[in-house]
Amino acid sequence: MRILIDIGHPAHVHLFKNFAKIMMGKGHQVLFTCREKEFEIELLKANGFTYQSFGKKYKSIIGKILGLLKFDYMEWKACRKFKPDILLSHGSMYAAHAAWLVRKPHIAFDDTYNMEQIHLYEPFTPVLLTGDYEHPRVSKKEIRYAGYHELSYLHPNYYTPNKDILKDLGVTPDEKYVLVRFIALNATHDIGNKGIPTKQKIEAVKALTKYAKVFISSEGVLPQELEQYRLKTRPEQLIDVMAFASLVWGESITIPAEAAVLGVPAMNNNNMKSYYLIDEQDNYGLCYCYKSNEDDLNKALQKCIELLKRDKQDLSAEWKAKRDKLLNDHIDVTAFLVWFVENYPGSKQIMTDNPDYQYRFK
């Protein structure tokens, strides 16, 4: 089988990497395509994947419209050359359109439920895989599975934190540190979302340094006052940094979701509603969701300080128990995807007739 996987965000590399390695180990051929947003290329190289880059993403609205035409054409050309049997993506309109043009199936994951994107790819996509938590039904083509995207790469079947990262960070096992994540807010679903004001970012980081070391991962330029806290590890080490943190806080949605699945207390300030983060908050108590207004920023900061004042081992043990419950309730997403793709389209019918079939993949 020849499989083309289109990547639109660094987290999508993680989403598909274990699936790709398993499929390649079975003799299937896999090609990744991508646009360059942040550090997708570094992650693809670190995993040894064959990939084709279509260049930089566009930031302006007009640029995004032009990019749709350009990247559609480049995806179609990649398909014509690679000749995939099936295409996979996280809601990629480019993969969907190219798949339709070459008359091959496109399987899409989705966990953001941005209708402006869904309208562009759903008509050309025969199946959408979405989590079984509460979220808007975006299509009659949905198949819901018991999991989150983050479980495809942070499930204990695939990931064990590397303690060597502590040496790279210059911290001891007993020392508290906070991972802070700031994002560029350039995606289509970020339009109108201004994020955390610079002044509040500086004030919050300064406040956190009174209780723990602070490391900042940022998509863009940091204020001069915060540059000293910039994380200097390699992109592929970010998850290890997160795994040993006492707390994760920031504007990003993906990073707090990863922290929650790892059993690390996570704080999110973002005006975009994240259904899976809300599920992890309401049903497991693993994270805290706030908006970016000043009142919510103060609430988030106070919650951060409250948690950082607690004993490190006690806090870690409490979050581990919460994580264990989450893992017990969900499937091995990668194992499920391997089965689903290898047996498609029969797997689609099986899941339609008997959704509980997925619990074989634990």
Task: Locate predicted features.
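A nucleotide-sugar donor-handling region in carbohydrate enzymes
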Residues: L129-G195
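Donor nucleotide-activated moiety binding/catalytic core segment of transferases
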Residues: F71-E75, G220-I255
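A donor-sugar binding/catalytic signature common to diverse glycosyltransferases
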Residues: L87-A98, A108-F109, L238-D279
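Catalytic donor nucleotide-activated moiety binding site of glycosyltransferases and closely related
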Residues: N47-Y58, V180, L185, I202-R234
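C-terminal amphipathic helix plus adjacent low-complexity
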Residues: L308-K362
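A conserved, positively charged/aromatic
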Residues: H106-A108, I118-T130, M242
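Conserved nucleotide-sugar phosphate-binding/catalytic loop shared by glycosyltransferases and other
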Residues: I7, M24-G67
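Catalytic binding pocket for nucleotide-activated donors in carbohydrate/polymer assembly enzymes
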Residues: V261-A321, K325
